[in-house]
Each structure stands twice: as C-alpha cells, then as structure tokens.
Amino acid sequence: MKFKYLSIPFLSSTLLFSAYASIQSDLRNLIQETTKQDVDVYKVIKTSEGRKNLITSLKKSYEVNPDKTTKLLLDAWKQSAEKGEIDIEKINFPDVGIYATGNDPLKIELKVEYFDMEYQDLNNFSINAKLNYNFNWHGNYSSNGFAAKKGDKHVFDLPLAIKPSSKNQSKTISFITKTGEGVDTEWIEFPVSLSWSLQGKINKVKEILRKSFWKAMILEQILNTQLISLDTCFS
C-alpha cells in the first residue's frame, strides 16, 4: 500500500459533460448568455484545443455571472457523483493518502452512497456526501500496525461535508489549462471548507481503526482552506 504525504489535502472529481445532454445544453446556454458565443459542447470536448477553449469560455462566464456558473459546475459534479463517476480514489487525507499499488494483495471498491447539494450563491451552499470503501484482500498484508489476512473484507464509510471556506474571503474559482510532457490538462478549482471522518461499518473494522495508524482519521477533521478540483475529464 502506498502512503503519500501531502501538505494540502485535495479532493478531486470528474465532470463528464459529454455524458449528460442536459448539462451540455445548460452549459451552451450559459456561455451564449454571458459571452455571446455559441459553443457546441459536444464537439469542442473531443479535442484538446476545444477543451481549452471551453475552459476559457467558462472563465469568461464566471466573470460575468459567477453564481450561475458555479451552480452549473456543481450540478455537473453532483450528476457525476450520483452515477458513481466521481474520482473518489483521489482523495488525499491531511496526513496520509492511501492507495493500492500493483504489489498489494488488495482490491479497493469505491462508490458514492449519496451526494446531496443545496446552493443559493457562492457564500451559501452546502454538500453532504457519503463515500464507501470496500477493501478486499486476496493475500496477507502487514504494515504500520495494520494487518489483514487473505479473504478479509474491510468496509469503511467516509462522510463528507463541504461548504464555503470561512478563511478565504475571495472564494474565487480558478480556471486552469496546462501543457507539459505531451499531456494537455484542464481543470477548475475553488476553495472550500471540508470536514470528514473515517468510520468502520463493523466492530472488527472499528477496532482496526482504533489500533492502527488510521486512528487519527476517526475523529472529525475540519479543514477551512481546501481546494476542490473539478477536473474536466471529458469522454
């Protein structure tokens, strides 16, 4: 298992605009309303240049109507989450991010149990979600006070609460495009306040949490200056 230490926790999600006709239509209407450009979202998301242009158009839309643009992006994120297409494996915890490597006798199954959102404006929105982790062990494993045997199954819940950052007064969204090493990437990120806790679903798993290096994750973590990355991973 890989332990990745980070200075800034980061929550990543995927916006699959191409998968939802309603989001595509709303996005096209928003860009036309705010920038006077008619962008065929279905076509532009198929190329790197088109995706960059879409990010640029969204940035302009945000400058004209930040509340409406933010609401549309969060709606797209919510739809992705409800279909289990959120990149929840990219959650990096405050002290340690946990990833399965190719050498670990482990298969991690991840799903979104629910993703509820209320939105009024940039200063008044809330997201409450619950993520489920199933660790299925097909071999013995031991590290840092954590041990598992072949055939073990550990089930964890991770409730999340997200709201506007109380320590970031600007609350501005960043629209970013980057090219490097032959890979073009585009993403959207904004500051939030994030709280979460890791919970075992049965007594055995709860005991593992209490006795291993994961014990620090049982208590509710409240992080006031975090970034959510809404990756524009178009299909």
Swiss-Prot record:
| Pfam families hit by this protein | Lipoprotein_3
Q: Which InterPro entries match?
A: Lipoprotein_3
Keywords from the UniProt entry: Signal
Q: Where is the signal peptide?
A: 1-18
For this chain, the family text in UniProt reads: Belongs to the MG439/MG440 family.
**Could you identify this protein by its name?**
Uncharacterized protein MPN_012
Q: Which organism was this protein described from?
A: Mycoplasma pneumoniae (strain ATCC 29342 / M129 / Subtype 1) (Mycoplasmoides pneumoniae)
